[in-house]
Amino acid sequence: MTDHPRVSNSGSNLSTNPPEILLPNEADSLKAQARENSYRDFMMIYFTLMTGLRNTEVIKLTIFCISPYGEISNDVEVPALIAKGSRSRSIPLHPDLKKELHSFLIWKAGEGEPLESDSPLFCSKRTKKPLSPRDFQRIVQLHSTNSINRSVHPHVLRHTFATRLLAKSNLSIVQQMLGHKSIQTTQIYLHPTRDDFTKAIENM
């Protein structure tokens, strides 16, 4: 997913209060900075950008969620136990993310991290236990500050995923991928820009 996401035109009244997102170059800079300093941090950021999971869902994922039978699955399973509202869902994994997850599991083995099915996918380097939501927040804030000169919350990664996905699909698909109970919640991503309006007129 490399298309330019829909962002608001700050000088226009066509869009009001859209979710904060990362532009493609910002997402690339964030990933590059994280990868240079911590493979685990990079994987958490990359995984969230490619799946749109919530902060609390990412940190509670286990190995089983992405590799239930010894190989990387085609989907990440978000079980009811960790999903908001106890609504389980399955999200397809992009081929590039699948390859990176395969490398990540090899890296984890080399680092002596547990790889049992119930082991955390992302864990503390020191304790090998699951990270907290605050830990993930600090990770994203650190790397975003150092790469794009502004501190962003993990939810911005989720917003970025949703906005880019909507540009390639429809609101119903985005609703299902994000795990929203109501499609009204998903409608916050319907913020067309002036360019969107211009293209719509040109395509009439």
Give names to the regions the model predicted.
Residues 1-11, 73-75, 115-119:
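Short, charged hinge/linker segments at domain and secondary-structure junctions
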Residues 2-39, 96:
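Long, amphipathic, Lys/Arg-enriched alpha-helical "connector/arm" segment
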Residues 16, 83-102, 118-139:
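C-terminal catalytic core of Y-nucleophile DNA break-rejoin enzymes
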Residues 24-51, 55, 114:
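Basic, Lys/Arg- and aromatic-enriched nucleic-acid-binding interface segment
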Residues 44, 56-61, 174:
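Alpha-helix N-cap/helix-start motif at helix boundaries, enriched for small hydrophobics
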Residues 50, 158-180:
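C-terminal catalytic core of tyrosine-transesterase DNA break-rejoin enzymes
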Residues 60-97:
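Conserved tyrosine-mediated DNA breakage-rejoining catalytic core shared by Y-recombinases
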Residues 78, 82, 183-203:
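Catalytic-site neighborhood detector that most strongly recognizes the C-terminal catalytic loop/helix
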